[in-house]
Amino acid sequence: MVIYAQKDISNDFIKEIIKTGEILGEGHVSSFKACYQCGTCTGSCPSGRITAFRTRKLIRYAQFGMKSAIIDSEDLWMCTTCYECYERCPRTVKITDIIKVLRNIAAREGKMAEAHKKTALYVFKTGHAVPINDQIKKARKEIGLTEIPPTTHKYPDALEVVRGIMKDLRFCDMVGICTETMQLKPVEWKDMSE
């Protein structure tokens, strides 16, 4: 069991969460303040059924402004963004979007799960998070779709646009993507608990 002290609680972090989430609309991300810890989110979470992930714990830490408890936690990266919690919350807390905002904050601090870095690298390389292979093409054709989706697979010139956006937003720097070698740079995690 981890015990947190008063020094771990920060109103500045609460403000940072709200400021980072402003792009989603006024009051959207600050909806985490309305959570009364009923547990509906945790009970409906598919990740929580097979891991120790507890959605409401992240929201509680956000309410208390416990930055290191959130960004140093693997739990932050266990959410599949399925929106079950979001849809079922009786207080209309925008949980999934809040988790995305918390991930953005963690990534800016150099705290991103390795699997998410690899996915980001794949997006940089191909324009997609999920590869298109012969099995996917066959399945698409069987259900009446074109074998190749109308994305960067079909329009390869658009891939340079995607890469340009990622570079302009400094996403590659944040994730640690070497744009010349198309590999992840080795990055040391900063220990925020000290």
UniProtKB/Swiss-Prot annotation:
Its EC number is 1.8.98.-. Binds 2 [4Fe-4S] clusters per subunit. Its cofactor is [4Fe-4S] cluster. One of its GO terms (molecular function) is 4 iron, 4 sulfur cluster binding. GO terms for biological process: anaerobic respiration; electron transport chain; methanogenesis. Pfam families: Fer4_9 (PF13187). Pathway: Cofactor metabolism; coenzyme M-coenzyme B heterodisulfide reduction; coenzyme B and coenzyme M from coenzyme M-coenzyme B heterodisulfide: step 1/1. Keywords: 4Fe-4S, Iron, Iron-sulfur, Metal-binding, Methanogenesis, Oxidoreductase, Repeat. [4Fe-4S] cluster 2 binds at C45, C79, C82, C85. Part of a complex that catalyzes the reversible reduction of CoM-S-S-CoB to the thiol-coenzymes H-S-CoM (coenzyme M) and H-S-CoB (coenzyme B). The heterodisulfide reductase is composed of three subunits; HdrA, HdrB and HdrC. NCBIfam families: CoB_CoM_SS_C. This is CoB--CoM heterodisulfide reductase iron-sulfur subunit C 1. It comes from Methanocaldococcus jannaschii (strain ATCC 43067 / DSM 2661 / JAL-1 / JCM 10045 / NBRC 100440) (Methanococcus jannaschii). The lineage of its organism: Archaea, Methanobacteriati, Methanobacteriota, Methanomada group, Methanococci.
